[in-house]
């Protein structure tokens, strides 16, 4: 997906929010993979990754998978130390009510994240005219420079909840945030601590399950329920206001997260490039009514 194609898309939804310091933002509506193209396993889950190819995946705000994401030993792998193009990735189908399961393994000192109900969001830097004065010895001139409008993608994590992926023993985020543990693995990043904290250490596989049903969200880590919360009501607003995404600290993030999933209350799954090596496997989802 190229920027010019987004600007031309007739399905784009535009909104202006005075609460976000007058910033105009756009939510791109792009082609999605049809679920009929996916394998359904014996438990009724759609397989989002088959361990062989990256069908259905692409970079956030891109029309391809960045080269640092690859397949290694049957797992979806991010090569944090390697050369090439990085960036977050998404699975190109939006889900509303679901049971989402996967396993992750993080490198020593590593950090990543699992996104759900994500939207591709961009802000428009308007066209403008600048007048500049140039001098070269006795010669001077006033030149008018026109700058075209520019579309800037905003970080995926300001549009949706994030389930943290972290080496709790070594990464400094494990001790940051308003409450100890609020940025540790499987927490609702910077909002709710995962209790009990039963993550396995770096280099070992951890199992995560995330359920969403009419805005009721639950995180499970290694088959244990660790947190639950309700989207789109006062509880959600209070969580946002007590986090780094508060209306005061980050108006655009607050506006987008307050209405995460958009008017249709659905969005993409995604994985974060935080610069560290990470692996994901057994990625599957069951659609629930």
Predicted regions located by residue number:
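Bacterial Sec-dependent N-terminal signal peptides
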Residues: 1-22
């Amino acid at each position: 997906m190229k920027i010019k194609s987004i600007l031309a898309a007739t399905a784009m939804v535009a909104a202006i929010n005075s609460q976000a310091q007058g910033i105009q933002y756009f939510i791109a509506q792009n082609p999605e993979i049809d679920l009929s193209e996916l394998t359904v396993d014996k438990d009724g889950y759609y397989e989002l990754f088959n361990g062989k190819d990256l069908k259905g995946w692409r970079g956030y705000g891109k029309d391809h998978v960045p080269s640092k994401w690859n397949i290694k030993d049957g797992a979806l792998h991010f090569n944090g130390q390697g050369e090439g193009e990085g960036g977050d990735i998404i699975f190109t189908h939006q889900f509303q009510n679901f049971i989402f399961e996967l396993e992750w393994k993080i490198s020593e000192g590593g950090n990543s994240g699992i996104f759900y109900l994500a939207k591709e969001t961009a802000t428009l830097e308007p066209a403008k005219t600048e007048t500049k004065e140039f001098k070269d010895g006795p010669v001077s001139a006033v030149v008018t420079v026109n700058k075209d409008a520019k579309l800037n993608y905003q970080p995926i994590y300001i549009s949706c909840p994030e389930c943290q992926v972290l080496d709790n023993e070594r990464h400094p985020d494990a001790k940051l945030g308003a409450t100890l543990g609020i940025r540790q693995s499987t927490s609702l990043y910077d909002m709710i601590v995962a209790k009990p904290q039963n993550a396995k250490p770096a280099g070992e596989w951890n199992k995560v399950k995330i359920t969403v049903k009419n805005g009721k969200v639950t995180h499970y880590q290694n088959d244990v329920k660790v947190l639950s919360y309700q989207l789109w009501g006062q509880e959600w607003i209070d969580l946002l206001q007590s986090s780094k995404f508060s209306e005061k600290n980050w108006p655009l993030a607050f506006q987008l997260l307050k209405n995460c999933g958009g008017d249709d209350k659905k969005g993409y799954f995604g994985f974060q490039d935080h610069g560290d090596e990470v692996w994901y496997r057994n990625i599957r989802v069951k659609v629930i009514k």
